Amino acid sequence: YLVSPAAYAALGAYMFLLILVGFPVNFLTLYVTLDHKKLRTPLNYILLNLAVADLFMVLGGFTTTMYTSMHGYFVLGRLGCNLEGFFATLGGEIALWSLVVLAIERWIVVCKPISNFRFTEDHAIMGLAFSWVMALTCAVPPLVGWSRYIPEGMQCSCGVDYYTRAEGFNTESFVLYMFTVHFLIPLSVIFFCYGRLLCAVKEAAAAQQESETTQRAEKEVSRMVVLMVIGFLVCWLPYASVAWWIFCNQGSEFGPIFMTLPAFFAKTSAIYNPLIYICMNKQFRHCMI
């Protein structure tokens, strides 16, 4: 054991709690949306994509971590580490790029930079495909030799190698690529879209250009998506910051808990998206009841 057995027991219990909550709420989101035709709107396709991403994390990552924490180390070998790291990375990246698509959709619908544009089913499918392609370009390279997945923190889960300069894996270039293309760029797009969105909402309210009902509906959707972005930042920013610090300070001493806490805090992202969606979408709640 790298730390006390009680810490591994607490970790296992935490993962069990995430599975207990994460699987039902994400499955419920999928089931209710697919079962009710009026919920099958283009925007909801992207929200469904978030639920699928969260289920990847729950089934492919959380179950593995709970099992390994019961043993005190990663018992599933190289293949298990690759699978767990891949599913956790894929789920997190699909969620991030889905939020990018949602931000762009909100910007185009509310700010109207393209006149007479309507977000259709085809646009939603293109957005889904884009989020998957971008997520795969982040999750697949460590499986084929550009960087690698290794056990991290308390050695019960696997992630991208930020820790070493292992020969033959080009870990440095991959970390720089990942932080630039799969973290800074998407966040910049999200912040740009919501910056413009807030300005447009204020201007529309001042000019009373649209009916009060339309304005209220757009505001509710925008508020829901903004909350999802804030939730993503709260969950993933500590992990990204610690990973970057470790990458920039290789050779420095730090305990296993240092990386474990932000890594497992990030995993709560599989719960907050469906809960925000369920709590803030009246139509969904009516269909669910």
From Swiss-Prot:
Pfam families: 7tm_1. One of its GO terms (biological process) is G protein-coupled opsin signaling pathway. One of its GO terms (molecular function) is G protein-coupled photoreceptor activity. A motif ('Ionic lock' involved in activated form stabilization) lies at residues 105-107. The keyword Nucleotide-binding does not apply. The keyword rRNA-binding does not apply. The modification N6-(retinylidene)lysine is found at K267. This is Rhodopsin.
